[in-house]
């Protein structure tokens, strides 16, 4: 059964903020809650094998992982503060929202979260912060659109 939630995957880019603005308004109209989902990954050594198979070896550098986590938490707090400020100024409607942090490959975790929690809709930017201008749509967004069982709205 679907939940009354709007899932907004965020990567702290301007595209994310646009998706937030749209998503918060959408949630207000639907009487829904917003879930801001950020997926991060800890660096791994990737070895390419023939036929495009990729094997990952986890770095066991705890210090490195701790630094990544600190940065991710700081970025998420910054985003949350921005959202609070926009709600306070009336730029965003005042809807209930929560922040979720997951480790992994962004498209996989977004799809997994959708499958587990069945949001009414996924609203995300057409591209992320590491996007090349030649791409019309980001690879994460494209993958989510292709494989999601929940409606996906991509905001340019």
Placement of each model-derived feature along the sequence:
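General small-molecule cofactor/ligand-binding pocket signal
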Residues: 37, 98-102, 153
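Gly/Ser-rich helix-loop-strand patches that form or flank binding pockets
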Residues: 1, 108, 112-156
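Small/aliphatic-rich secondary-structure junction motif
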Residues: 2-62, 88-89
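A structural micro-motif
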Residues: 32, 95-97, 150
